[in-house]
């Protein structure tokens, strides 16, 4: 019987262990940031251990960094963590994309941009959205601080092999529907736990026709459906994305010959298989307090089916039967490791251009990396957003999570391109609605959610 992409990647990296039991995997790339690494570095010091492979470790700061006045950090905990990362990287010989560096940004954007993220690798990071890197035909998953220390010391990690799930996605995406809507649809349909215990491979016509940036959006949110990791087979789109980047292989053609073997065999079988027709999708909006609580734009919010729904409606200040258009928005956030790449900003700017943010909205655009910010400014996207009334910020995780100065006020509804709508995720009492960048941009200039498939209702003015 043939092997899946996941089987091939896993088998390449097993150092020790029997099938069915935890196995020791070799780690090709360890990405770190300021929040989950300090304890791990301190553990090395206490045991007087070296960091085994600093050349396979790369650091940046993203979670705590301010996105304005970036060198004047007011939060003492954030300042201490950032300074600790600088000190630790210098002491242990780790390459650091420091504050203000041309390579600094959200860790899951910096890896691909620099060419560190490549097909065939096992990539770990002390962050739950490490599945993003699976879009390149890699195994990527998040780890805890104790595991970060283990990788520091050994360049390996113990893991129980998950089962395999194949999600076949075919059909052309309708106008106004994006990669973000695909993953929101999957989670809304099957739930936040449907991927628990699985490594998910996304494939099919729709995936093949996507850019790398779109593919990363889908893999980024694999964890929100419960999966340990999400991945896609590498192809010419992947190879051309990696080619010419700072850390791309010296012998690119040799690497590509190997990467081309990273495909699921025709006779391979997944433990679970799901089919999806992308051509019938609508823009999605979440109404509740986890990504499963989402609806197509044309549908009303569902009836209360259990205590979780009851609590979600109470927290969000909404009721069954309402529609997304009725939500009283106060904030719009375009950013995060899900949707802060150049193509995301270009699509948002296309809608925003020539319009104005409504008076009831405070709108932020936070590029996910310095590279994206520089590229956006080189083609004038910053001017489009600023002229429309958006705040144009420095790179970082920003309003995706309440660990930095960018937070949504208590009780305020925010249209967000991020990946989690948990209670308090964007700040105490914040009410988060997950959408695509286009939906968020249109909401900013209309003052509420609209059906972006109908361009006639995208209008400016205050």
Curated annotation (Swiss-Prot):
EC number: 4.2.1.33
Segments crossing the lipid bilayer: none
Domain of life of the source: Bacteria
Single Gene Ontology BP annotation: L-leucine biosynthetic process
Cofactor note text: Binds 1 [4Fe-4S] cluster per subunit.
Entry GO MF terms: 3-isopropylmalate dehydratase activity; 4 iron, 4 sulfur cluster binding; metal ion binding
UniProt keywords, alphabetically: 4Fe-4S, Amino-acid biosynthesis, Branched-chain amino acid biosynthesis, Iron, Iron-sulfur, Leucine biosynthesis, Lyase, Metal-binding
Cofactor dependence: [4Fe-4S] cluster
Metal-binding in keyword set: yes
UniProt pathway annotation: Amino-acid biosynthesis; L-leucine biosynthesis; L-leucine from 3-methyl-2-oxobutanoate: step 2/4
InterPro entries, alphabetized: 3-IsopropMal_deHydase_lsu, Acnase/IPM_dHydase_lsu_aba_1/3, Acoase/IPM_deHydtase_lsu_aba, Aconitase_4Fe-4S_BS, Aconitase_4Fe-4S_dom, IPM_dehydratase_rel_enz, IPMI_cat
Record-listed [4Fe-4S] cluster binding positions: 337, 397, 400
Catalytic activity: (2R,3S)-3-isopropylmalate = (2S)-2-isopropylmalate
Family assignment from sequence similarity: Belongs to the aconitase/IPM isomerase family. LeuC type 1 subfamily.
Subunit structure: Heterodimer of LeuC and LeuD.
Record function comment: Catalyzes the isomerization between 2-isopropylmalate and 3-isopropylmalate, via the formation of 2-isopropylmaleate.
PANTHER family: 3-ISOPROPYLMALATE DEHYDRATASE, HOMOACONITASE, MITOCHONDRIAL-RELATED
Protein name, UniProt field: 3-isopropylmalate dehydratase large subunit
Organism name: Listeria monocytogenes serotype 4a (strain HCC23)
């Amino acid at each position: 019987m043939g092997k899946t992409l996941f089987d091939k990647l896993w088998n390449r990296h097993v150092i020790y262990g029997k099938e069915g039991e935890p196995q020791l995997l070799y780690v090709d790339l360890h990405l770190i940031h300021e929040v989950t690494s300090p304890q791990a570095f301190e553990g090395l010091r206490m045991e007087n251990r070296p960091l085994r492979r600093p050349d396979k470790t790369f650091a940046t700061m993203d979670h705590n960094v301010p996105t304005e006045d970036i060198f004047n950090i007011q939060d003492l905990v954030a300042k201490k963590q950032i300074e600790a990362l600088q000190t630790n990287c210098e002491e242990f010989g780790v390459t650091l994309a420091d504050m203000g560096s041309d390579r600094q940004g959200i860790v899951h954007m910096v890896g691909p941009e620099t060419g560190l993220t490549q097909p065939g690798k096992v990539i770990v990071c002390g962050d739950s959205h490490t599945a993003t890197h699976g879009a390149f035909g890699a195994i990527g998953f998040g780890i805890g601080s104790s595991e970060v220390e283990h990788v520091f010391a050994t360049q390996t990690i113990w893991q129980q092999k998950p089962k395999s799930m194949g999600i076949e996605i075919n059909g052309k995406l309708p106008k106004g529907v994006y990669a973000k809507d695909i993953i929101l649809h999957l989670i809304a349909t099957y739930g936040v736990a449907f991927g628990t215990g699985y490594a998910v491979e996304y494939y099919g016509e729709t995936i093949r026709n996507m850019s790398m940036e779109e593919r990363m959006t889908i893999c980024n949110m694999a964890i929100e459906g419960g999966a340990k990791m999400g991945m896609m087979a590498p192809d010419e789109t992947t190879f051309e994305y990696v080619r010419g980047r700072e850390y791309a292989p010296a012998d690119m053609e040799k690497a590509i010959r190997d990467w081309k073997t990273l495909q699921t065999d025709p006779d391979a079988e997944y433990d679970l298989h799901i089919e999806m027709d992308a051509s019938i999708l609508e823009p999605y909006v979440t109404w509740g307090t986890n990504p499963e609580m989402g609806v197509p734009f044309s549908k009303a919010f569902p009836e209360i089916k259990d205590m979780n729904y009851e609590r979600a409606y109470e927290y969000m200040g909404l009721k069954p039967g309402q529609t997304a258009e009725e939500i009283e928005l106060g904030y719009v956030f375009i950013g995060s490791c899900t949707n802060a790449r150049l193509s995301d900003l270009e699509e948002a700017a296309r809608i925003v251009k020539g319009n104005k943010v409504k008076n009831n909205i405070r709108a932020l655009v936070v590029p996910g990396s310095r590279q994206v910010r520089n590229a956006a400014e080189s083609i004038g996207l910053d001017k489009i957003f600023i002229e429309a009334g958006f705040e144009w910020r420095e790179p970082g995780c920003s309003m995706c999570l309440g660990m930095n100065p960018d937070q949504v006020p208590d009780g305020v509804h925010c249209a967000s391109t991020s990946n989690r709508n948990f209670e308090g995720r964007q700040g105490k009492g914040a009410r988060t609605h997950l959408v695509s960048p286009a939906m968020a941009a249109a909401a900013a200039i209309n003052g509420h959610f609209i059906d972006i498939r109908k361009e006639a209702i995208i209008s400016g003015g205050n």
